[in-house]
């Protein structure tokens, strides 16, 4: 499926999602207002697009020498690994950038359907669902390339690379811009709103302390996630699925695998583990894939031509800066994306959360006005609501592993026991699997999983799944003639 047919499919899916995307109406730009965004990341680019509707001028500053095409940025080494926009993020992408789905597909991205993939979890494969769920699959660098191109084409947006932000300009009442270093020279850039989208390593707390404001409490959940990736040439004979996900049950191990198609007729294969060293050599990469409880990753890495060496990355903890709990925050300055909350990447929530936070910022600007000193507090309250659901999902799942440490939500052990039953039920119930998928894709809140009628259905389906469990081998993914 390509071209306008793909857009029609994705738009139809978007209309059926339960939660409507509310993009704030654009304000009339009657004054010469300037927004300065730190970081041309996914978060920064979504933010630039949203604020372009509210500000006369939007300037995006990035310390990297930004690439022209779809290659990974130096400042985003995680971009070499498998990424996904969840349904909520994809919906936001299409609302803010009409036609970008066709542009991505024309540049080699793949349209995949959930029912054409294989998702192994809780000791078995999750069932097919009763409605089509399409998604665009591409590398993160390709997505960033198209976002940069679309944002740079906006008449009131400028993206400047190789510009490092060293601090805030503050007049005693509000932030008035940023201090930058460009070509070895320090200078200032004034603005009515500064948005820090510089990522997990954000220096916003230090900057706030320098101008006399308290710094946010930081929640660290130590998950010690490591992941290793190789890219392979893609052939239809590799497996009879458009993508594959394998996640071991916590009782059995900590391993996971993601096999997804990307542009250039390639597979990106990312293997994840916890509380261990990342894979660095080809033999260990192959042995890991072959040792998983489902065969898809092993089939691809042994049958397909490898195009890259093993690339690895480590993330020691998820972290959430609690700006919404501060009584005093500087006017004219907010943080967004990983600068607020950096999730365990294994759940794929980061880019989608950033997109939704950008929309929340647009709503806050429309409600409060650019000059309102209450704008930052209003935004942080809305951002916290965006972050709460994926944070609960990720942190709850992380605490299924006894080595995880950090602030543990009350009732986590009980919830995790119930979630194990939900995942068991997804093996036999398309309805339960569809609801679980909506929660994981951030289009429904986790609370839907705890409705009395749903709990009853889970109890029944989980018992059915247990009765059906057997030692039968998984169906072969590669025709015998291709073996």
Language-model features: locations:
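Extreme N-terminal leader/targeting segments of oxidoreductases
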Residues: 8-35, 53-55, 66
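N-terminal Rossmann-like FAD-binding beta1-loop-alpha1 element of flavoenzymes
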Residues: 33-60
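N-terminal FAD cofactor-binding segment of flavoenzymes
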Residues: 50, 70-117
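Short beta-strand to alpha-helix junction loop
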Residues: 84-85, 130-149, 203, 279-280
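Helix-loop-beta segment of a Rossmann-like dinucleotide-binding subdomain
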Residues: 121-140, 271-274
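FAD/FMN-dependent oxidoreductases across multiple families
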Residues: 137, 227, 277-386
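Predominantly flavin-linked oxidoreductase catalytic cores and closely associated redox partners
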Residues: 154-288
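C-terminal helical "tail/cap" subdomain of flavin- and related membrane-associated enzymes
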Residues: 362-483
């Amino acid at each position: 499926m390509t071209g306008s047919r793909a857009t029609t499919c994705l738009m139809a899916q978007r209309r059926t999602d339960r939660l409507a995307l509310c993009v704030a109406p654009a304000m009339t730009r009657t004054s010469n207002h300037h927004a300065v965004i730190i970081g041309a990341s996914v978060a920064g680019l979504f933010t630039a697009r949203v604020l372009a509707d509210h500000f006369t001028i939007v300037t995006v500053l990035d310390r990297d020498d930004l690439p022209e095409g779809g290659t990974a940025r130096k400042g985003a080494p995680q971009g070499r690994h498998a990424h996904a926009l969840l349904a909520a993020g994809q919906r936001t992408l299409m609302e803010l950038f009409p036609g970008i789905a066709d542009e991505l597909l024309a540049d080699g991205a793949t349209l995949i359907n959930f029912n054409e993939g294989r998702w192994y979890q809780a000791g078995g494969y999750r069932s097919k669902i009763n409605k089509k769920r399409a998604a665009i699959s591409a590398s993160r660098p390709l997505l960033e390339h198209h976002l940069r191109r679309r944002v740079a084409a906006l008449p009131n947006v400028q993206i400047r690379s190789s510009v490092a932000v060293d601090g805030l300009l503050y007049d005693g009442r509000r932030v008035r811009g940023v201090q930058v270093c460009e070509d070895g020279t320090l200078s200032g850039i004034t603005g009515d709103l500064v948005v820090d989208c510089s990522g997990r390593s954000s220096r916003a707390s230090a900057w706030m302390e320098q101008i006399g404001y308290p710094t946010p409490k930081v929640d660290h959940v130590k998950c010690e996630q490591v992941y290793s990736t190789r890219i392979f040439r893609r052939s239809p004979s590799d497996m009879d699925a458009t993508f594959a996900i394998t996640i071991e049950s916590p009782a059995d191990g900590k391993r996971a695998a993601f096999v997804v198609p990307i542009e250039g007729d390639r597979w990106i294969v990312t293997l994840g583990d916890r509380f261990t060293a990342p894979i660095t050599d080809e033999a260990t990469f192959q042995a890991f894939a072959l040792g998983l409880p489902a065969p898809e990753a092993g089939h691809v890495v042994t049958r397909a031509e490898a195009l890259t060496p093993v690339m690895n990355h480590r993330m020691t903890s998820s972290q959430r800066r609690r700006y919404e709990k501060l009584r005093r925050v500087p006017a004219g300055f907010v943080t967004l994306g990983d600068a607020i909350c950096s999730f365990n990447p294994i759940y794929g929530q980061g880019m989608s959360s950033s997109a939704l936070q950008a929309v929340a910022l647009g709503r806050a600007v429309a409600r409060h006005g650019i000059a309102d000193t209450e704008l930052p507090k209003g935004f942080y309250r809305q951002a916290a609501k965006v972050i709460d659901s994926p944070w609960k999902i990720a942190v709850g799942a992380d605490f299924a592993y006894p080595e995880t440490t950090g602030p543990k939500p009350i009732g986590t052990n009980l919830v995790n026991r119930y979630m194990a039953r939900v995942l068991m039920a997804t093996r036999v119930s398309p309805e339960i699997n569809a609801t679980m998928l909506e929660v994981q894709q951030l289009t429904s809140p986790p609370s839907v999983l705890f409705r009395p009628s749903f709990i009853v259905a889970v109890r029944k389906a989980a018992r059915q799944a247990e009765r059906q469990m057997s030692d039968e081998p998984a169906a072969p993914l590669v025709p015998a003639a291709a073996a």
